[in-house]
Structures are given as structure tokens and as C-alpha cells.
């Protein structure tokens, strides 16, 4: 396995570990999710160019669009929680249930 692929898989694993460990604040969870999406984007781009699958060239861009939408929704939720409750604890997400 190429060292760049190993580094990207390690970056994804560390970001996933960060999501599992830093669950108290929503901002740290969102940052770890963005790290996961960025490492997936770079890994997907490198694998497509390495295996010459140019018919799948739009897949990383679609992943990037979904990542931007996820970041926008996450930041909107962060603003809503922090203005309503004064903090960004993930445990406040249970209060948003209908």
C-alpha cells in the first residue's frame, strides 16, 4: 500500500476516533466530521486517478457537495443550540425532539 493511502486512512481513522471521543461539544464533533469527509475526498480522488476510472471523476465532487451541505446544516444547528441554550453541548440535542 502506498504511504499516501496509508496516511489518508490513518487520518480518517483518527477523525473517526475524534468523533467517538469528543462527543461533549458539537463544534469538535463537526470538525472531526469535516476531517473525515476531507480525507475521504482526497482518498477517492487519488484512487480514481490511480486506477484510471475517469467515468467516476464526478464522484469526489458530489462527495464534496454533500460535505458542504452537511457543514451548513451542522453550523445552523450549532447556532440554534448556542443561541437557545448558551452552550454547544451535544446532550442538548435531545431537547430538540418533537
UniProtKB/Swiss-Prot annotation:
Protein topology in the membrane: Multi-pass membrane protein
Record flagged with keyword Membrane: yes
Keywords: Electron transport, Membrane, Mitochondrion, Mitochondrion inner membrane, NAD, Respiratory chain, Translocase, Transmembrane, Transmembrane helix, Transport, Ubiquinone
Assembly behavior: Core subunit of respiratory chain NADH dehydrogenase (Complex I) which is composed of 45 different subunits.
InterPro entries, A to Z: NADH_UbQ_OxRdtase_chain4L/K (IPR001133), NUOK/Mnh_C1-like (IPR039428)
Pfam families, per database record: Oxidored_q2 (PF00420)
The enzyme's E.C. designation: 7.1.1.2
Biological processes, Gene Ontology terms: ATP synthesis coupled electron transport
Name of protein: NADH-ubiquinone oxidoreductase chain 4L
Catalytic reaction(s) noted: a ubiquinone + NADH + 5 H(+)(in) = a ubiquinol + NAD(+) + 4 H(+)(out)
Single GO MF descriptor: NADH dehydrogenase (ubiquinone) activity
Subcellular location: Mitochondrion inner membrane
TM annotation in the entry: 1-21, 28-48, 59-79
Biological source species: Perameles gunnii
Gene that encodes it: MT-ND4L
One Gene Ontology cellular component: respiratory chain complex I
Amino acid at each position: 500500500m502506498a504511504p499516501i493511502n496509508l496516511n489518508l486512512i490513518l487520518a480518517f481513522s483518527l477523525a473517526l476516533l475524534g468523533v467517538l471521543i469528543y462527543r461533549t461539544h458539537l463544534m469538535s464533533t463537526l470538525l472531526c466530521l469535516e476531517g473525515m469527509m476531507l480525507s475521504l475526498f482526497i482518498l477517492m480522488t487519488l484512487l480514481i486517478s490511480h486506477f484510471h476510472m475517469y467515468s467516476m471523476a464526478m464522484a469526489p465532487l458530489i462527495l464534496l457537495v454533500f460535505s458542504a451541505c452537511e457543514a451548513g446544516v451542522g453550523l445552523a444547528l450549532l447556532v440554534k443550540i448556542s443561541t437557545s441554550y448558551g452552550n454547544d453541548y451535544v446532550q442538548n440535542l435531545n431537547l430538540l425532539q418533537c
